[in-house]
């Protein structure tokens, strides 16, 4: 991996006289073996995740330089493994594919980029959709053995991330045609649950199910912002996300999913053309009491973070440019989105709660100082 990182492309003017660039013949030999070695390692009876992660990154590093011109066979090699029943191999191939394609999310549009994406879509889009449907069916099947639920969930999470990668620049025709099939699949993942995927209540790390739902919310937000004209199912997405949000408490392990879900709702509110979904006073009141107030208030864990590292806490709380999913930031952005579309209504509702919180603080400052902070 380090060799691919430091010696794959070396400028002749800065080339190290001791460690020179890899020759073209050596590169060709390495390219021919990277994916087969990855598959071989993943097929072992007890595959080493540490080694597999290095191999995943090695393939991605070489692909960033050589795909597709010098390595046109890469996609065929990866796609050929999507039909395997070995979950370890599937996980490695999907993780490698995501490592290669995730860079598309932030790249500027260009003819070369679109040619690369179209090449991948032509070979991978339909197998990806078939695998997504298969993994979804197995995950929701009550007869699926418990021991396979974790790898299935990880595969599905990576498939959702790949779906986002391939949609980030433009809407693939294959995905557009599949939206009627995909929409009920995606919304079902926001209500589906299995004990094996929930995780330990004491664990602060997001569970596999939370990661899956976070990926679904990211896809919903992307498609709502970019491809609304082919998305008549948007009201169903909003209802599914709203119903899911009500099931999550204040635990730190749910911070990412709550932030992603609120981010999606903020994006839909800002559109303006979806006003009828939110404009009733009762809906806006529910937004305030069920989303804004609970997530804008300080929790015990927030106090602990502040006590351990106050500067870092303030930076996370105030700095808008850093990409950190915090509940308070998501709730504040949701208020701003509502103000853009329902200024009078939301000001009246929020002002009432602000006055109530300040009155509670005045009645008992030592006990209710968090109310003042929230106000």
List PLM regions with ranges.
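Eukaryote-specific detector of the first structured module of a protein
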Residues: 1-2
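Alpha-helical repeat/alpha-solenoid scaffolds of the HEAT/ARM/MIF4G superfamily
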Residues: 8-142, 146, 169, 251-374
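Internal alpha-helical scaffold/solenoid segments in large eukaryotic proteins
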Residues: 53, 68-83, 140, 144-148, ...
